[in-house]
Regions:
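Conserved alpha/beta catalytic core and glycan-binding cleft of carbohydrate-active enzymes
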Residues: 2-145, 167-224, 228-239, 246-247
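Carbohydrate-interacting/catalytic domains
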Residues: 126, 137-340, 344-346
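Accessible peptide chain termini
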Residues: 1-2, 285
């Protein structure tokens, strides 16, 4: 679509009007149809309505998200800390459009080709494949997956249960277009290669805690900050033996303790599998005062007291938060430079 919109060095205004008119007509004739744009020119607000003088697409294909995730996963585990920003960059623009996220054949090749790109043994490759699809389903945005016919029984069971997890928990989709539906817990754990975040609805008891470990190191007692006192029960784990994993799971519910971590008043210790994704349902303690999902206003930046290079940026969600803009620009430039270098090598 880039060539249609742009005529260097000017915008193709006639093409823009054509797309607006075309999308309006299609929507009137076929109300249930989905219009998805694939565009790499950073054209703004593709998914805003024609009534607001924009193009009126329903979704935009997030090729950048797929490319960044693959670049991160293809790196050797010991080198992934240098690519960690590519794992988290997407949340800096996640709410600028309505995005479709995909790990389909056209993006990553067949499952066999995808596995060949990943480092490690056969078992480690399988674990990373599960972690990649887990991160896809937990990340904000509409999902589109189309694995090829080479899917084995364990991976088929995994994808089935992952889809059931998504369908049965509104926090994973109800507020996809609202930044209040997402909150970082850990996103500066460069050395550990772990990300942790919350998916939320307006109901506190529907909160989901997701912890993703993209390193080959498993943990028996990994501490993570949590939003409130209460019980945290594991509802999904990519390392379940059912899926061909090692069985590093959290069989019992965890009670949050009053110990600061990740700039949260409460925290808990959990088992975290290597190359694994663990998902927890949250039950607030009785009498727990319901707090705002995301505090409004500026978020102070202070030096973190917890592991690695964590900083007090855990409450940041999108680039709309003014305190994040400078950091976001630095990350975008670094990742863009890395993408350009990778393209030059091809």
């Amino acid at each position: 679509m880039d060539g249609l919109i742009f005529i260097v060095p000017m915008r193709n205004l006639q093409a823009l009007e054509f797309l607006k008119h075309l999308n309006s007509i299609v929507k009137k004739q076929y109300p249930g149809i989905l219009l998805i744009a694939q565009e790499d020119g950073l054209w703004p607000q593709l998914t805003d309505s024609v009534e607001n003088d924009h193009l009126g697409f329903d979704y935009k294909w997030s090729g950048g998200w797929t490319k960044d995730l693959l670049s991160y996963l293809e790196a050797e585990p010991l080198d992934r800390r240098n690519y960690y920003d590519q794992l988290t960059l997407s949340m800096m623009y996640a709410y600028s459009e309505h995005y479709v996220l995909t790990l389909g054949k056209r993006d990553v090749g067949t499952l066999k080709e995808f596995l060949e790109k990943l480092p490690g043994s056969s078992r480690q490759k399988d674990a990373q494949l599960r972690a990649a699809y887990g991160y896809l389903m937990l990340h904000p945005g509409v999902k589109m997956t189309a694995p090829d016919g080479d899917v084995g029984p364990e991976m088929r069971a995994y994808l089935h249960d992952l889809n059931e997890l998504y369908r049965n928990h509104p926090a994973l989709y109800a507020m996809d277009g609202n930044s209040d539906g997402f909150e970082w817990i850990q996103f500066t754990s460069y050395d550990e290669n772990v990300v942790a975040f919350l998916r939320k609805t307006e109901k506190q008891e529907e909160t989901i805690l997701a912890v993703c470990n993209f390193s080959p190191v498993s943990y028996d007692s990994y501490r993570v900050g949590v939003p409130f006192a209460g019980k945290y029960k594991e509802i999904f784990n990519s390392d379940s033996e059912k899926f061909g994993g090692q069985g590093v799971v959290n069989a019992r519910a965890k009670a949050a303790v009053h110990m600061e971590c990740d700039n949260r008043e409460f925290s808990l210790k959990l088992k975290l599998p290597a190359y694994g994704v663990a998902v927890f349902g949250c039950t607030p303690e009785k009498g727990e005062v319901k707090k705002s999902s995301v505090k409004k206003g500026n978020v102070k930046k202070t030096a973190g007291k917890s592991r690695g290079k964590r900083m007090d940026k855990a409450k940041m969600t999108v680039v709309e938060k003014s305190v994040a803009v400078k950091d976001a620009v630095k990350v975008v430039k670094r990742v863009a430079s890395r993408r350009k270098g990778a393209s030059g090598d091809e």
